[in-house]
Structure formats: C-alpha cells, structure tokens
C-alpha cells in the first residue's frame, strides 16, 4: 500500500521517467470560447506523455519518450522541440502517416478538443523499448496509446514487463470516446487496466466520461473498487482528493491565476514525478505536483518555461518539502 508519509525507493537506473504515447500538435485558439468560431489558431507542442517528458527534464530529472510522429513538417517541428530540451529522439519513430493534431479552444476550464489522429498510435514493441523498461524507474502512459492498435498491444506488453523489473507504472485515463476506434468506446477496457497499474490520476471530467456523473467521493470509490492502489482525482478549482484505499486526503488548489488549462494535468505529473525521484514523501510529492500545475496555468499551451524546483517551492510556500 502507498503510505502518504513514506518515500518510494527506486533502484539505481539510467532513466528516471519513461513516457510512452502520443506526440501531437495542439492548435489552440487565440481567443477564449468553446464554439470554434475563432479565426486564428497558434501551433503548440503537445501530447500528454511528450509534455511530461519535457516538463520533467526542465525540473531536473532524466526523462525519455517512446512515440511516433509523421514523416512531415509537423513531425519535424515536434522532434526539434524535444531536441531543444535535450531529450533523445532516437526512440521516436517517423512513420508514413500524418502527424496527429488536436484543435482546441483556449479555455479557463476544461478545453473542448477536436481530434485528428494518424501517426501517434503506430508505436510497436521492440528490443529498444524492452531495454528502456529495464533501465527506468517510472513508466507513464495515457489513454491515447491504448485506444488503438498497434500501440494498445505495445502497452499491454509494457505493463507486464514493468512488473518483472520493479518499475512504477502510472496511468492517466484521459478518456475521450472520439479517440477510440469505431465500435469500441474504451470504457470497459480502461476499467480492466485499473488494477494493473500502480498510480492513476483521473480528472473529474475523465471520471464522469468513464463512470457517469456522480460526486467526487463516489467516483474515487469506483476506481478503488476496481483495484486501484493510489487514486489522484483532480477537481479543477476545487483542488483534488487522493486515496490509497485506507486514507483519503484533500488538497486545495494552489492556482492564483488561470490563463489556459491545456497541459495542467501533465504539469502535475511532472512535478509529482520530480518529487518522487528526488526522495520526497508521497504527500510532499503530490504538493509539488499541484504547485507545478498551478504555475503552468498562468500561461497558454501545455509546455511553458518552468523555473527550477526551489523557485516553485518558494512561490507556493513549499519550503519544507523534503
């Protein structure tokens, strides 16, 4: 069981965090609104696992990503961004499909997306991926790679391999029915994965899409009843509730300014992982995650220039973190 006042002890391995999944272009409107009537959109680096890899690198931990992009201009744009942040690109395949893209309105709440998918789910299991699993402390994936094959089969193998090598497996169930193949809405499949991972972080919207509308406390219980070991249920402006099945803790939001919510969850994961890797307790790592997320909310786009951890701790009065 995950105890909030304990640290997670990792073996000494080359990589701190391995993210597996989508790299894509976020086209974000320059004006607020959920009706897509804006005439102007700006191109941003995107994809939850990719965002986490970059954010984590900026926070001082060694991250790596396995993904696939198109052999096109947008794919080159994404690869260049990884290189700018000193992340190895040799595990990102360029495939003969168009780079995936999401059209999204700039939003102060949950943004409304339109998905254009092609290259992102062409991730295949390989000896290289097996090597990375053996040599990393934490593996992260989202619902995008499990929504279609071949990447779904790849993640299934990945989960089994992680168990062999004592790798912490974390899952972001960012469920959208539109990203799943026709005739497969994915909810039952997601439910079948919950007991197989170590940590899961649904948003309130994710929980509603998976289980239907309910109170946060009941949603939390549904994840736990399906075998979740640690559930981090984020509630937007209402903070978050986190439970290991025995103890439940509520965290208030640290956000003092909200410009754009795109990538806020990814920023949380990045801060949380950084805390775990640096030897903070589980509770203190959660607090750091919420602080990094609050900082990101001040800016448009999923990737922002994050300051170092000491600066974040000072900004959000987390000086006692350790």
Curated annotation (Swiss-Prot):
Gene name in the database record: pfkB
Cited SUPFAM superfamilies: Ribokinase-like
One GO process term, biological-process aspect: fructose metabolic process
EC number, UniProt record: 2.7.1.11
GO molecular function, a single term: 6-phosphofructokinase activity
Catalyzed reactions per annotation: beta-D-fructose 6-phosphate + ATP = beta-D-fructose 1,6-bisphosphate + ADP + H(+)
Binding locations of ATP: 201, 234, 239
CDD domains the UniProt entry points to: bac_FRK
Keyword annotations: ATP-binding, Carbohydrate metabolism, Kinase, Nucleotide-binding, Transferase
Alphabetical list of Pfam families matching this protein: PfkB
Similarity section: Belongs to the carbohydrate kinase PfkB family.
Record protein name field: ATP-dependent 6-phosphofructokinase
Its job: Catalyzes the ATP-dependent phosphorylation of D-fructose 6-phosphate to fructose 1,6-bisphosphate. Together with the adjacently encoded sucrose 6'-phosphate phosphorylase, may be involved in a new pathway for the degradation of sucrose. Cannot phosphorylate D-fructose.
